[in-house]
Amino acid sequence: MDLWFSELHTPYVKFSIQIDKQLHSEQTEFQRIDIFESKEFGRMMVLDGYVMLTEKDEFIYHEMIVHVPMAVHPNPKRVLIIGGGDGGTARELLRYKNVESVDLVEIDERVVDISRKYLP
């Protein structure tokens, strides 16, 4: 049986990925969290029906969200991440020797728990 995940972008456009299996699904107080396994992208985290990250290309998002502001700040020492429960943004920030502390605030602790389990 073919399993597919589709993310609707507009009434005329949707992005579909063939799925090997669903590893996790739950509805939290804040959102629905799904983890899928796919041949093309590896593991995928989907929140409320939208792909948040995939193993194959998550670094692209996290590098851009971190390296651009870090390039223009003269000497960042303390950083606050709002959201980012998957940990990728924190990982990229901790590559900078001048960063002394990173605080991460995530509204949904299950995103952190599930990321630790399925997206180490």
Whereabouts are the PLM-identified features?
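The AdoMet/dcAdoMet-binding core of the Class I SAM-like
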Residues: 2-4, 53-120
